[in-house]
Design a protein with these regions (language model features):
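Active-site signature of alpha/beta-hydrolase-fold catalytic machinery across serine-
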Residues: 104-108
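Gly/Ala-rich beta-loop-alpha elbow adjacent to hydrolase catalytic centers
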Residues: 94-98, 102
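Serine-hydrolase catalytic core
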Residues: 13-16, 30, 160-192
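Short, surface-exposed "cap/lid" segments of acyl-processing enzymes
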Residues: 3-60
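A catalytic-pocket lid/entrance helix-loop region that shapes and gates access to the active site
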Residues: 131-147
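Active-site nucleophile loop of the alpha/beta-hydrolase fold
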Residues: 116-126
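Catalytic nucleophile-loop/oxyanion-hole region of alpha/beta-hydrolase
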Residues: 60-86, 91
Length: 192
């Protein structure tokens, strides 16, 4: 199921000057809206910019239910390769799950000039929490309430979902973070 992208949740791209670019990756249940201000600042500074909308995000919660780590990592890889066609030097900036995807890209692309991880999902989920997710899946629970925004400014709005699909959350850890965390010691990409 694919529905229309929510207004403000669209991917964003900018052709800059020179040979440097920035890839920005939003977080789980969020949308490109959470990173658009940073993307626009990078564009104003003259950088090439890619800000993709990850699979299942920025539409409806139902679209996120079937999405998995393999979809999001493919989205990040595609955006990286798109930017790579225009740039020699790329910095990747990720928020939350976008931070996990940033770390994943860095483990696969040592040529990345640098990474910035903002509140990254960077550690495996403890066994008891993974067991809890697996129990919810066995019981047929499709989604749980969203964590909610932690933005201090009450007038600031982020386009995100009001529920968290359990299967997608499980995939973030079981198929993603839990598998590449062992690569951290061998990473050579500079990180802020």
């Amino acid at each position: 199921m694919t529905t229309a992208t929510l207004l403000g949740a669209e991917p964003w791209s900018h052709i800059g000057r020179g040979s440097s670019g920035v890839l920005l990756i939003h977080g789980f249940t969020g949308s490109p809206s959470s990173m658009r201000g940073v993307a626009q600042a990078c564009a104003l500074a003259g950088f090439h910019v890619e800000l993709p909308r990850l699979s299942g995000h920025g539409t409806t919660v139902a679209d996120l239910v079937p999405a998995r780590w393999s979809d999001w990592s493919a989205d990040a890889e595609t955006a990286y390769q798109t930017l790579r066609q225009r740039c020699d030097r790329i910095v990747v900036i990720g928020l939350s799950m976008g931070g996990a995807l940033t770390l994943w890209l860095a483990t696969h692309h040592p040529e990345i000039a640098g990474i910035v991880c903002i509140n990254p999902v960077a550690q495996p989920l403890p066994d008891e929490m993974m067991s809890g997710l697996e129990s919810l899946l066995r019981d047929g629970v499709e989604s749980i309430p969203a964590i909610g925004s932690d933005i201090a400014d009450p007038s600031a709005k982020e386009i995100s979902y009001d529920a968290t699909p359990v299967c997608a959350l499980h995939s973030l850890f079981a198929d993603g973070v839990n598998n590449f965390v062992k690569s951290y010691p061998s990473m050579t990409v500079p990180m802020l």
